[in-house]
Amino acid sequence: MLTFDHILIRYGELALKGKNRHMFEKQLVQNIRSVLKPSFPRLTYHRTFGRILLGLNGEDPLPIKDKLRKIFGIHSFSLAIRVTNELDKMKQAALHALQASEGEVKTFKINARRAYKPFPISSSELNHHLGGYVLANTEQISVDVHSPDVEIKVEVRESGTYIMTGEFKGLGGLPVGTSGKVLLMLSGGIDSPVAGYYLLKRGVTLEAIHFHSPPFTNEKAKQKVVDLAAKLTNFGGQVKLHIVPFTELQKHIHEKVPSNMEMTIMRRMMLRISEGIAKKTDALAIATGESLGQVASQTLHSMNTINEVTTTPVLRPLLTMDKEEVITVAKEIDTFNISILPYEDCCTIFLPPDSKTKPTRQQAKKFEQFVETEAYVQTAIEGTETMVIKSEAAVSKTEMDELL
């Protein structure tokens, strides 16, 4: 009995990776397996040139499709019928695939691809053979090579022939784990989780750092950040979250620095602490959710002054995006409703009404003379707590008790 018993996975950008292609493909298979294996133990995984083939072995394809849609590195995928490389079997499978198509079907097209060159029939000949068979065994259906109701894709490979009629879009990008580690400054707002999402899309392994200032920021604010990190695990596996005690340093800055320079000095301190954590965790870069000109601390002048304190690259994935664009993505990845919960983070307390939009490095150095920078930064790094979030449901009660 013919049935859709495989999923054929395509990847786009990986095909351009030359000699490193094997490494990218291997990581993608590993990521797919780690996502699917716990819930679908009967799946089999086979990597062939330009494709990954999942054998369903009786598993329900619908929930598998939902999970594949969230794995970076996948360009698209299709449900497929696999048959042996025999013309009669291909004809029967093509007809079955058409008959199983949903909706009204009046026109079709065969699109055959002979990836296995020893197969004696060319792609164009296959189109004619299979198309003729489908026409002879259906009524009131015709061929339309330009805009068909159903396109029957046929791929002949060494392991068999795969017949498909639909295609589901993936997220694209690179497989998570192929681009090194990045430490994301996760504030709890709308922007930084979206920045994390785009970093994952470029294949980074993500860790996050959050600055917590109790009692000015409460435990609900901390839980909010944990929940945001958990949302990011849907796209990139586990996330290590580093919680930095920031109260004493923030109070110290508030006491010693003029209000219009507080934000600049605070951001410089955050960057110093982040660099310290990045070095301890072997992160190659720090990332923020900053967008150029959005607030006073995100002008080019501010960024130039704040960046002075680190030699670690600072990535800003959202730099050129409008707020509305960011909000749209936040809703798509399901972080928006968490981000807008009304719990203050450390950047909103002691918020001065007159922050400088063009602070200079000289001004920052002048006022940092009154701040015990090294001692406070080291204390914050040493007091940092770390938790591992493996999925939305993986923050156990014990972990939360330790966190709170």
From Swiss-Prot:
Q: Which UniProt keywords apply?
A: ATP-binding, Cytoplasm, Nucleotide-binding, RNA-binding, Thiamine biosynthesis, Transferase, tRNA-binding
What pathway does the UniProt record associate with this protein?
Answer: Cofactor biosynthesis; thiamine diphosphate biosynthesis
The cellular location(s) given in this protein's UniProt record come to:
Cytoplasm
* E.C. code: 2.8.1.4
Annotated catalysed reactions:
[ThiI sulfur-carrier protein]-S-sulfanyl-L-cysteine + a uridine in tRNA + 2 reduced [2Fe-2S]-[ferredoxin] + ATP + H(+) = [ThiI sulfur-carrier protein]-L-cysteine + a 4-thiouridine in tRNA + 2 oxidized [2Fe-2S]-[ferredoxin] + AMP + diphosphate; [ThiS sulfur-carrier protein]-C-terminal Gly-Gly-AMP + S-sulfanyl-L-cysteinyl-[cysteine desulfurase] + AH2 = [ThiS sulfur-carrier protein]-C-terminal-Gly-aminoethanethioate + L-cysteinyl-[cysteine desulfurase] + A + AMP + 2 H(+)
MF terms in GO: ATP binding; CCA tRNA nucleotidyltransferase activity; tRNA binding; tRNA-uracil-4 sulfurtransferase activity
What residue stretches are annotated with the THUMP domain? Answer: 62-167
Q: Which domain of life is it from?
A: Bacteria
A Gene Ontology cellular component where this protein is annotated is:
cytosol
Q: Does the keyword ATP-binding apply?
A: yes
Task: Provide a GO biological process annotation.
Answer: thiamine biosynthetic process
Q: Which InterPro entries match?
A: Rossmann-like_a/b/a_fold, ThiI_AANH, ThiI_fer, ThiI_N, THUMP_dom, THUMP_ThiI, tRNA_STrfase, tRNA_sulfurtransferase_ThiI
Which annotated residues bind ATP? M185, L186, H210, F211, R267, G289, Q298
Q: Which Pfam families match?
A: ThiI, ThiI_fer, THUMP
Cysteine-cysteine disulfides: none
Establish whether keyword Nucleotide-binding is in the entry: yes
Q: According to its UniProt entry, what is the function of this protein?
A: Catalyzes the ATP-dependent transfer of a sulfur to tRNA to produce 4-thiouridine in position 8 of tRNAs, which functions as a near-UV photosensor. Also catalyzes the transfer of sulfur to the sulfur carrier protein ThiS, forming ThiS-thiocarboxylate. This is a step in the synthesis of thiazole, in the thiamine biosynthesis pathway. The sulfur is donated as persulfide by IscS.
Q: Which PANTHER family match?
A: TRNA SULFURTRANSFERASE (PTHR43209:SF1)
Protein family per UniProt: Belongs to the ThiI family.
Q: What is the name listed in the Swiss-Prot or TrEMBL entry for this protein?
A: Probable tRNA sulfurtransferase
